[in-house]
Amino acid sequence: MIKWPWKVQESAHQTALPWQEALSIPLLTCLTEQEQSKLVTLAERFLQQKRLVPLQGFELNSLRSCRIALLFCLPVLELGLEWLDSFHEVLIYPAPFVVDDEWEDDIGLVHNQRIVQSGQSWQQGPIVLNWLDIQDSFDASGFNLIIHEVAHKLDTRNGDRASGVPFIPLREVAGWEHDLHAAMNNIQEEIELVGENAASIDAYAASDPAECFAVLSEYFFSAPELFAPRFPSLWQRFCQFYQQDPLQRLHHANDTDSFSATNVH
């Protein structure tokens, strides 16, 4: 029998959080009861350690907080919450937000412009998100804003900047880089053939290695059936790094559903 952490008797000063309702989003329904219980335990600690800051009138309630915490903890379900120790605040806008962006061109000229962002991950600072795109991250579509920004945080544990190579054994770095760049080239070839909007993988993955790792991390957890057969070698590297196999999890859940359906009287 599973002992759900949120069903343990709490002190009179605590209010029970709606973990069971929070787990009902499509992305998390494939997890086993043991995995869901472990995820909730991590998410409870996440909410104790991190500060969720609503901005521009966004209203943050307990259900929203729980779902945000669950999505943050899914990538580190087996790695451990200490992998998220490089930030302490999550800033949440109600919708995509405008920021001042500074960039340098090929001849060294610095340009400034205002751009619309869905999210940001500062190297030694907070993660910035928006609720509209968080809501769009609840399904299994290949898009997940929170997992994308978490991947950047995991990436920077390996050095001063995001490189697309997370903290893995040194002997595995060359193979990881080879497979990641091969995936980028493959995605770019598809973009050139069918266009960005028709590409089966988000075109942002072809922009640089750090974004490729972040985008493919989204697909790893929310659309494994697209990632695994297309990039099998890189898929195995992701499974080894995250210590999870979402495709196997999905197949097991589908088999369980099929078995249940055939035994309905």
UniProtKB/Swiss-Prot annotation:
Gene Ontology terms for molecular function = aminopeptidase activity; metallopeptidase activity; zinc ion binding
Q: Which organism is it from?
A: Escherichia coli O1:K1 / APEC
Q: What does this protein do?
A: Involved in the modulation of the activity of the glucose-phosphotransferase system (glucose-PTS). Interacts with the transcriptional repressor Mlc, preventing its interaction with DNA and leading to the modulation of expression of genes regulated by Mlc, including ptsG, which encodes the PTS system glucose-specific EIICB component. Shows zinc-dependent metallopeptidase activity.
Write down the required cofactor(s): Zn(2+)
EC number assigned by the record:
3.4.11.-
**One GO cellular component, as annotated:** cytosol
Q: Where in the cell is it found?
A: Cytoplasm
The entry's Zn(2+)-binding residues are 111, 148, 152, 211
Name of the protein in its database record: Mlc titration factor A
This protein's gene is called: mtfA
- Principal place of residence: cytoplasm
What are the GO BP annotations of this UniProt entry?
proteolysis
What protein family does this chain belong to?
A: Belongs to the MtfA family.
Keyword set for this entry? Aminopeptidase, Cytoplasm, Hydrolase, Metal-binding, Metalloprotease, Protease, Zinc
> Its quaternary structure?
Interacts with Mlc.
Co-factor note (free text): Binds 1 zinc ion per subunit.
Q: Which domain of life is it from?
A: Bacteria
Broad enzyme group: hydrolase
Looking up InterPro entries in the UniProt record yields: MetalloPept_cat_dom_sf, MtfA_enterob, MtfA_fam, MtfA_N
Annotated SUPFAM superfamilies: Metalloproteases ('zincins'), catalytic domain (SSF55486)
